[in-house]
Amino acid sequence: MKDSEHHHHGHNGFSKFLHKLGFGKSKGKSHKSNTSSIHERENTAAKGPASNVRPARPNVSTSSTSNEVRKSVPVGNPTVHTKTGSSSSPASKMRNTVNLQHIQAANQKTRNAEGERKVAQRRVQSDKAEANDAAMSSSAPTVDVSEGNSAAEPKITPDDSDTPRLNVDMNDKINVDEAAAKSDSKLNVDQINSTTESEKRVEKVNPNIANNPLKSPDAVAYSSETVSDEKQPTEHPVSANVPAKSEKAVCDENTKISLTNTEHYKFHSLRGDVEVVVGDLERDGRDTSLGDASVNEAAKETDVDSSRFISDEKAVTEDAMKTEHASNAPLTDERHFQFHSSEGDIEGIVGTMQRQRQSVSSYDTIVPSQFYKQKVVQNSPPSLLSTDNKIPESGSDHPSSQDNSSKASLVENSQTQSSTPRKPLPTTTSPKVNPEPHSESISDTRPSTPRKVPPSTVPKMNPKLQGGNSVTAPSTPSKVLPAMSPKVAPKFQGGRSSTAPSTPNKVLPAASAKAAPKLQEKAASFDIPNKSTIISTKSTVASPIKANENSPALKSKASFEFPKELDPDGTWNAPIPYPDANCPMAPTYRNLTSEQEEMYEEVLKYCLELKEIPVASNSSKKTDLIELERLWLTRECILRYLRATKWHVSNAKKRIVDTLVWRRHFGVNNMDPDEIQEENATGKQVLLGYDKDGRPCLYLYPARQNTKTSPLQIRHLVFSLECAIDLMPPGVETLALLINFKSSSNRSNPSVGQGKEVLNILQTHYCERLGRALVINIPWAVWGFFKLISPFIDPITREKLKFNEPLDRYVPKDQLDSNFGGSLHFEYHHEKYWPQLVELCKSRRLGILEKWRKMGSKIGTSEWDLKGGEEYVELMQQYVRPSLTNRSSSPTVTPTVNTDRQPKTLTNSADELSPQKRRVENPKPVVKDEGPVSIVEDEESTPVVTKKEDSIPVAQSTKADAGLDAENDLLPKSGSGVSETPAFSHARDVSTASFSDAVSFITADSIE
């Protein structure tokens, strides 16, 4: 008992000792249990290895000090006693005290070493910063330190404190921060990471790097003198004597957009084209190459040809020639092309056909294959080198006929010019080059001598675009375009006449004659075209063509504007550019009442004051009207909305704005034909021919549906409507809808939501656009639907609907598809039809845009004037389509109405998908394979089957049975004229939408 008490008191004293040192806390355990456990461990350790009890570690706390002790304790347990005896003996206390002192000393030594290492690192960094400051600024004061301490390691003074102190002898007690402020040097690591006055000093030294996020000891703020002495790269080089550009003209580094390619950039820099190097960054909502905006703006402001504006001095440094630029933007529009082609800028015309899936001007596709292919094929995308744009050989002047030596000299000349400062040519008389044109090529009927005008007509450069530079126009000799094939001409001319009204040319100043020989050699090697041959100097609008059948301009125009896709078997594979020559055309809305004219003026005034509209229907952000949106607001457009709203002015204003917002949000002006061409791969929507009133005919074949229900189907329908509007002649505002429901299926109609969206688009945004709807082979479901809604349809709309009637009453036979009873044997081949439709619509659209610009870009311009008016009528009357007498061996059938069997259309629709199983009382005649079969036409153009010596008039011996013919006798195996090509068979099996678009279109017009 006494022994237990003795151990208890002894251990209690040791616990108090540990507690004073901050180690041994009992954590709620009794002293008795602690004393007994320690006593047992000490006795067990004294007995030796025979004991099964494992020796324990000393009881230490989990504080930070305990962790440090635990890390520095050597292997083993230093507190375990090896001799028996009381734990309260002086020897035991001494041993514990000595062990703790050793641990503290080791920990202190470790901290001191770590502190020395950090101080040494700071000193090295400080020395580096001082060395950099001394190198950058020789006059900057330096920090003096005691000798020997600059390179030696810092000394640590012994101290009881845990934090070591750096003993640095500073001469005259100069503060480090003050020395750094005087020397404008970089601060140390601790000071640079905090927002102090040092950052303000950096801003004063060099404002260009004030916002530099780089904060490191090596990031030294250069002085303004040092920055100015260094040679900075020229991002947008101009002539050496040109004054500095304004801040607006200089492109920011983060948003800079380069010219189209390196050769393009070098060419303009070589010639000193200020407005090409300097320009706005954005136009029409997208990034463009520098300089395009300035050219267009100058042309708009002066309303004359946008010729080159070049500074008086043309010296360009060699460093500017070597500047490389990435190509991110295509040539933008026709104005840009007109600017470059007017003076023979081949590199200026060179561009990319499509970058980032953006449609660009058609002129970018022709020049690269003609000239640029020889030079930078490795830098051009594959689309530039397509075989469709190749130009056939036409004499020795054509680039394709040049030999390898001429090509080598071409590259050599271009390299020499791109590395040598040049000055423009002196004013010279253009050489008269009159190559013999191709039989179907573009011919220039005007004299090639340049015309001069007084200097007062030369436009002044916009100061914003030229950056404060005064510029004048130089002279360049005119040259003649070589002969070109008809296939290239449509893309090159965009559907406009090759002749243009004469416009005076600018007076060009003389320049140094040193550069003349080389530049002439390069121009000769390029065979640069004459600007008068390519395009009008003032506008691209075609001049009226005289009614002369032998006019070379008319022949050339017909050779490149209109497609010729007549196969040897008589099949037509292209859209038709003009309606029938006897089609009457006249301006609309000329006989308005005074009240209607007042309503129109009120809405027109509202549109003129309309500056900005929302970007979307559910958005509060507004932007200004773009050029195409203002072009859309024609006189006829405003009157259409007044008619659709029953001449209610407020409703017309609201609907016009709603349509503008929808067109912007839907992207009508930016629709890419490549995006939706898959939807029309089977020809389910075809624009072909015109009716007797000049309306373009839009054919719908629901059975040719080839895609699943998706928003892309709606975009395809909108694209077809826009193309139909482009093809409308002047004075025509509506289209004719022709629907053939043969072999269609209503198994899986589109969703109700999509049907509502289509209906809303047609009745809200394409009001007053349906002129006539002609439907054949109508199934019972559609027939019943229209019978059901017939009492609710507007009487005017009801008159537009024609079911199962002979369509030649409304459409000329030579413009009506043979599937609908016409004599035009049309078979849809996507690879032939689609590119020609896109090109024809693009040329019409560009022609309208150019006429609108020429007329002043005003809202409320008449569509009759924009689409050509009398000029269009004259061309329509002179246009003759290729002969269609070469027909296929199958007879064409003219459907007629059998009123006695009319109800059968409502009961026999179940057999629409299997025409072989039909039973019709009056089938068509079957022609046996006993001899050759051909088609002849009598005086009334009635198709007749001729076999050996017998001939049977088809139209007299058969009837169409209201569209339900026995076409099992006219399947493809027997040579039917009905288009049933294998390309459509696979698509009809996955039909997903039968007649949604047709029904929606007719219903939308009736709702209005």
Swiss-Prot record:
One MF term in the entry's GO annotations: phosphatidylinositol binding
InterPro entries (alphabetical): CRAL-TRIO_dom, CRAL-TRIO_dom_sf, CRAL/TRIO_N_dom, CRAL/TRIO_N_dom_sf, PI_Transfer_CRAL-TRIO
GO cellular component entries: plasma membrane; prospore membrane
Biased composition (Basic and acidic residues): 111-131, 170-187, 914-931
PROSITE patterns (UniProt xref): CRAL_TRIO (PS50191)
GO biological process, one term: intermembrane phospholipid transfer
Modified residues (Phosphoserine): 525, 559, 888, 890
Domain CRAL-TRIO: 675-828
Cellular compartment(s): Cell membrane
Low complexity compositional bias, start-end: 885-899
Keyword Cell membrane found: yes
SMART domains linked to this entry: CRAL_TRIO_N, SEC14
Residue stretches of biased makeup (Polar residues): 79-110, 374-389, 397-432, 467-478, 495-505
SUPFAM superfamilies, per the entry: CRAL/TRIO domain (SSF52087), CRAL/TRIO N-terminal domain (SSF46938)
Membrane topology field: Peripheral membrane protein
Region (Disordered): 1-247, 284-306, 374-514, 883-982
Sorted UniProt keywords: Cell membrane, Membrane, Phosphoprotein
Coiled coil stretches, renumbered: none
Protein name: CRAL-TRIO domain-containing protein C23B6.04c
Organism: Schizosaccharomyces pombe (strain 972 / ATCC 24843)
Lineage: Eukaryota, Fungi, Dikarya, Ascomycota, Taphrinomycotina
